[in-house]
Amino acid sequence: MQVPPDPSAADMKRCFDLVIFDCDGVLIDSEVLSCQCLVELLRCHDVVLDLESAYTQFLGRSGVAIVDHYTGLGRSLPADFGAELQAAIRGSFARSLRAIPNVETLLRGLDITYCVASSSDLERIDFSLAVTGLRGLFEGRIFSADMVPEGKPAPDLFLHAAARMGARPERTLVIEDSVSGVQAAKAAGMRVWGFIGGSHYRFRNGRALLMAAGSDRVFERMVDFGQESADWGHDSIQR
């Protein structure tokens, strides 16, 4: 499926009918918390994984995908591992989760239809958005990998969300922070902009990572979303 050329900010509404936001790392600053829980829980089951590897291997992936990964390596995890992980993450979120700075202002002022599509299960998405005060902005517009046969990097979730929202793939923009999410959006025939404003990209070259995955542009602050700028696609973080 052919995607139209990358638009300027002034052309956004003309080019797009729908913006799909990923949740973790885009709407909420959750990836460090989630990956810390994963590393700690795996350690309890005698599986060693450092935080950087957790970002690289599992950012944007579902709990089922994580279990399948280790099963494929011959490392069996308990049948209730996914439930254990979600319980640990929920506790961490209740204590420490915050929304990405300025994302609420962006959403309230956005003049394009939008929704959220995440690899997380519906209960976790709902809880995360409620904790951060964003839940009311997505009423009836929440889509989970639970709804489709294959999660990211397969295109199923984004295609499902776009279809439910009445938008064609080529007129849909996806905002993603993970390699698997970028790959899923491109496989769906959608435009994708990488977001590197989450805490998990503080010491990583997020621009290079997401551009290599196929992202059309990369930005690091929600206040920059959709603004015409000569340095769109350039990582202004000096590392």
Please place each PLM-identified region on the residue numbering:
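Asp-based, Mg2+/Mn2+-dependent phosphohydrolase catalytic module
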Residues: 1-17, 108, 112, 121-239
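Active-site neighborhood of HAD-like aspartate-dependent phosphohydrolases
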Residues: 2-56
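Conserved phosphate-coupling serine/threonine residues in phosphotransfer and NTP-handling enzymes
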Residues: 26, 118-120
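Short beta->alpha linker loops
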Residues: 33, 58-62, 98-102, 120, ...
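An amphipathic alpha-helix signature
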Residues: 35, 39, 55, 63-68, ...
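Helix-loop "lid/cap" segments that line or gate small-molecule binding pockets
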Residues: 41-42, 62-76, 128, 162, ...
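Short helix-capping segments at alpha-helix termini
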Residues: 44-48, 73-76, 133-137, 166-167
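Metal-dependent phosphoesterase signature
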Residues: 68-105
